[in-house]
């Protein structure tokens, strides 16, 4: 459900009247005469497949600087034109977030009988804290650098929460802010999610998604555990959203041009990886068990491994997953994961 999957790489426009007939939500502040045509074909198929196989989905992601096409920011939805003003972009966000969520939740009702049966969480905004990358310039061309108080991030959560209210799903579906290196940027992240919730009638962002592309050397298990404690102590639900465990990875960043994603042979073994996985999982389970349930009733509610096996991983050379060449090739890390999961 990434933005480019719905919006496409090339813009196809339809009138507001056509859009409304298709069930699109056109907000009152939307002053343009047409909207981009949204493609829900892939989403609809994924929803049906998930339901047929008793699988839950997270909506990843509504706003993300990396994969929102450039034309979405230009005058007349043209990438070659100047960026629109803030009011126009606000209306586009309102239209996009509301329409996508409304479609998905309505489709859920058709397939499963009610919302929240398939999509249990939404990553409403992804990686705002790392907006300094070149591909985030489209957002800053409209809003400038709002630093710790981005109005458009807060706005996206407001629209998303309104959709949960519309479908009576505020207790069924959690809205997340999702980012990487969260274990090193705890205070910045808490400041951002607290800003999102500031002055709202409810905690519209009640979840923190911890992308966790960890290495067996970085972060330490103690650093990761300390971040978990702080997020839960602040009253947030936590999900570990993109977990893998690299070995022989260039953690000092000296080889950033390596197309194999910073592989660096340091003689680390899959047995060392397995030991780390066991310690890591035992730590996560202990943090969940020992949390203050009056402050964080839910605590850690999800853990997503970022891929099936090493040979198709985005960091395959660093062997980050629980299986090797195929799903029929379990590594020692898989057994370690299972052993830790049995911890009482």
Please provide the spans of the model-predicted regions:
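Short, electropositive alpha-helical surface patch
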Residues: 70-90, 183-199, 316-326
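Substrate-binding cleft and catalytic face of glycoside hydrolase catalytic domains
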Residues: 1-176, 180-182, 247-253
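Aromatic-rich peripheral "rim/lid" segments of glycoside hydrolase catalytic domains that contact
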Residues: 12-26, 111-114, 123, 127-146, ...
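Short, contiguous strand/loop micro-motifs
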Residues: 32-34, 213-215, 267-268
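Generic structural microfeature
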Residues: 45, 95, 117-118, 203, ...
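His-enriched metal-coordination microenvironments in redox/metal-binding proteins
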Residues: 59-61, 212-213, 306
